[in-house]
Amino acid sequence: MADRVPDAIATIFTDAFTGTAATGGFVGSGIMLAIQFGVARGIFSNESGMGSAAIAAAAAKTQHPARQALVSMTQTFIDTIIVVTITGLVIVTAGTWDMGRDQAAIMTASAFGQALPGEWGSLIVSVALIFFAFSTILGWSYYGERAIVALVGDWASIPYRMFFTALSFVGAVASLELAWTFSDLSNGLMAIPNLIGLLILSGLVVRETREYLDWDPKLTKSPDEVAGFVARQKMNWR
């Protein structure tokens, strides 16, 4: 299968930009469709620009926010450049990319089933999907709970959990097309105000990041010095 990788890479680029009538949606049927699905699925994978990953990063214990922010930046590279690229190459080399967008899980399982001996490929993908789906539910539940608590207070935590649990069941029995459409719409509604905020605060981010890197990239100073530095940054934000 390794000898098919160069052809797979060529197929991805040629079919994305020449308008080949592909049915899979992975390669796409034109440059606009390629961009549409690429951006939509990329955001769904790495949450770039949505502001949701910052909620999880804010819960981390770190000596300075800029340090955690720099670490969080790696998730886009790992999720999209490494994991998604490898998965895409497996699907294209296996020839399962034209099964249709509604058969995404079967498409991936079938591709890995051809790549690995016996039933190991399909089994690994099936088990991984269970863990990925469960962890995704937990993650987005946490994101939403932090948001609702910040908006209306702690009393909304329990009602939100009940509503989220019920909505998870609805998502499990709804059609895949409806689930994808709702997810893409929700991601867009999150990204638009967040990107506006990022643009407005871009100068602040650049200033604070430069000061952090110039101050001490390795954070080898004492805790008191770190606390003083953080306090000065908070004053500068006003």
Task: Label each residue range with its predicted role.
Residues 1-39:
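Helix-loop-helix hairpins and the membrane-proximal interhelical loops
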Residues 18-33, 114-123, 154-159, 175-176:
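Membrane-interfacial loop-to-helix junctions in multi-pass transporters
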Residues 51-60, 90-94, 106-110, 142, ...:
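Re-entrant/interfacial helical elements at transmembrane boundaries that shape
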Residues 62-78, 154-162:
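Membrane-interface alpha-helices at helix entry/exit sites of multi-pass transporters
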Residues 85-94, 125-136, 163-175, 191, ...:
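Hydrophobic core segments of alpha-helical transmembrane domains in multi-pass membrane transport
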Residues 93-119:
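Membrane-interface interhelical connector segments
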Residues 173-189:
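Extracellular/periplasmic helix-loop-helix junctions in multi-pass membrane proteins
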Residues 188, 192-238:
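Terminal cytosolic tails of multi-pass membrane transporters
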